[in-house]
Amino acid sequence: MVATNKFDLTVQSPGRINLIGEHIDYNGGHVLPAAINLNITIGFKKKTGSVCHITSKSTDGFLFNLEEPIKPKSNNHWGNYVIGVIDGILKLRPNLLSAFDCEIESNLPIGSGISSSAALECGIAFGLNELFNLDLTDLDRIKIAQKAEHDFVGTKCGIMDQFAVTMGQKKKLILLNCETLDYQLIPADINPYKIVLLNTNVAHNLASSEYNLRREDCEKALKIIQSHFPEYKHLAEVPLDIIKTLEKEFDEVVFKRATYVVEEENRTQMASKVIQNGE
């Protein structure tokens, strides 16, 4: 996150990539994301009154009133990412926000898998924290942004996107344990190679996609495993041989989901070691 001096405050909030560890964050395993050099720019300006005006250079703006209950807008309205964060801040820091306007501009492709939604959520949280001296920690803001996605958008996401956007640093990968939230910054020294992002122009929306269904499948798998081995709290920590032993208790799709999660967790930890060893 970077704060500059335009408006009362201008924030640049980056997108993110994830090298490996897909669908692992909500299964309590390890992921290996990094912030990227594309971002959302948000300009904030304080004002009198209680009505806030949010504008965007790419879509219609909207208004909300801080003195009225904050409720989700209609399905898929982009404003839910913003007002969900506002709701979370008001619950943690009641009566500390006053009216503001903000203008949003982005060079992050929307729905392209580089977390434009998390960039918006975390940028709003960071900016308001700075603007109103809310004394929210990094982790406070990360969790506010994640909860906004759960409660206002309808995506039961893990914590990786918001964590990577908030904690990412230039030329660093983040090895994140999504259960404990312990993390390690790993130098992304891959010369003479570069990571290149390709925009396929295929858009997706996690809230209306199979994302939530995949999470439900993983939860079904864990519930079956816990009926035999209650010591396991997360799917990513279950040994592969246990999943294979219980194969007949899973339907075909759930078995594939569970197997993938455990194998992907192993691949992620192996990949992080290879990168750290410069191999």
Where are each of the predicted segments found?
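Short arginine-rich
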Residues: 152
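ATP-binding N-lobe of GHMP and related small-molecule kinases
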Residues: 1-118, 125-138, 143, 147, ...
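Short glycine/threonine-rich loop-to-helix capping motif typified by GTGT followed
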Residues: 113-119, 244-249
